[in-house]
Amino acid sequence: MLVSKKPMVLVILDGYGYREEQQDNAIFSAKTPVMDALWANRPHTLIDASGLEVGLPDRQMGNSEVGHVNLGAGRIVYQDLTRLDVEIKDRAFFANPVLTGAVDKAKNAGKAVHIMGLLSAGGVHSHEDHIMAMVELAAERGAEKIYLHAFLDGRDTPPRSAESSLKKFEEKFAALGKGRVASIIGRYYAMDRDNRWDRVEKAYDLLTLAQGEFQADTAVAGLQAAYARDENDEFVKATVIRAEGQPDAAMEDGDALIFMNFRADRAREITRAFVNADFDGFARKKVVNVDFVMLTEYAADIKTAVAYPPASLVNTFGEWMAKNDKTQLRISETEKYAHVTFFFNGGVEESFKGEDRILINSPKVATYDLQPEMSSAELTEKLVAAIKSGKYDTIICNYPNGDMVGHTGVMEAAVKAVEALDHCVEEVAKAVESVGGQLLITADHGNAEQMRDPATGQAHTAHTNLPVPLIYVGDKNVKAVEGGKLSDIAPTMLSLMGMEIPQEMTGKPLFIVE
């Protein structure tokens, strides 16, 4: 007869952060007798779910994708922005073999180094500090012809904010005594992602032919002329920057071209125009054979050099379970199904051996404040059945309510969402205890605990950078450890299951069996 398994259950209450202040706090305002009792009577602690502790920039709010990757990985997983910040700070960036190789090859052949990217402090698609580091790398390695092609932002930054960035780079080139800003164009053209190839073509011609609708002696003059035409940063038309007597910066075969955007979606189209031999988005007036480097991998089918290939995560929680012949279930509503599967598995789409998945449809409503309980009753019913089935060694479940209803900014609805969750937690905890299992309750980031922005008085619809609760329910006598973070959860689960923790997991168990 099959032995009935006593599952280790992880319940992730999405957007359920911890905030001492009671004002505009849907979690405090809700009637939550179950969570209150668990917090009062069970081992518990607070853990970090934002900023550096989850691989984001300092104090940046967490999000569901990052949260679940860290939860499943058992180690801090650095996002591209932070990974680059760290590498530049410790100077590993300046020794990156792909970047140095491209620069050295161009320099030794007397060719130019072209650097292009979104010149922005927004930190969403790129960061100007990374572009500055690339300029320094090229100069340090002796490149004489360094051309910067600046894509202007105005979406992740204020609509007219590019001047200070352009000034900074013009001053840098003056100090270096070589290199210059060679072109400016709005991201509307250079960073399209909807196959509007007529836009991309304007950027491509500007880069390859050094031909644009306008020309200016300096980047700042070119920008000011665009503003006079009533073009904000995002929509600045193709402008060649070239003073009298300066050589033109048209791209030639053998030149190096470094694309400094780290986010893929808006980098793919213009990259394909340079890299794909069979490109058919538009008829290219000039096909150049440049040494093209993508800062990160924009798509697996774009065959060109990558300075920072995706870091593959070995021995995530899901993979480790499979290697140890354990059974696991992932269960959530539509809104967070990808998070407990793809993201929790470190970006792996396929399920592991012994991994089942249950998807509960989220309600078809315009906004979730209209149905704050969402599909939590059905989700709980299926989860309780799975706990009692004896089939699973571990179960990962996400309740989306705190986040999805928190995003609406409607306080009354968020309170109802939290109250619905309290009933669900009660059912789940009872089921786990009835089969002798163990339960961890936590969150991936905050949201519902802050429903109004104190500075503006407007509804606060974003995530927070506040800590999240972690509660243990089970028959083990455990002591909580302070100072934890999301990447400590997987090691905590393994330790409570009496399993070895793989060496790749650098997180630490947060409940120590006494």
Curated annotation (Swiss-Prot):
One of its GO terms (biological process) is carbohydrate metabolic process. GO terms for cellular component: cytoplasm; cytosol. It comes from the Bacteria. Mn(2+) 1 binds at D403, H407, H463. Insensitive to vanadate. GO terms for molecular function: manganese ion binding; phosphoglycerate mutase activity. Its EC number is 5.4.2.12. Its cofactor is Mn(2+). Pathway: Carbohydrate degradation; glycolysis; pyruvate from D-glyceraldehyde 3-phosphate: step 3/5. Mn(2+) 2 binds at D14, S64, D444, H445. The active site is at S64. Keywords: Glycolysis, Isomerase, Manganese, Metal-binding. Binds 2 manganese ions per subunit. HAMAP family: GpmI. Monomer. This is 2,3-bisphosphoglycerate-independent phosphoglycerate mutase. It comes from Escherichia coli (strain K12). The gene is gpmI.
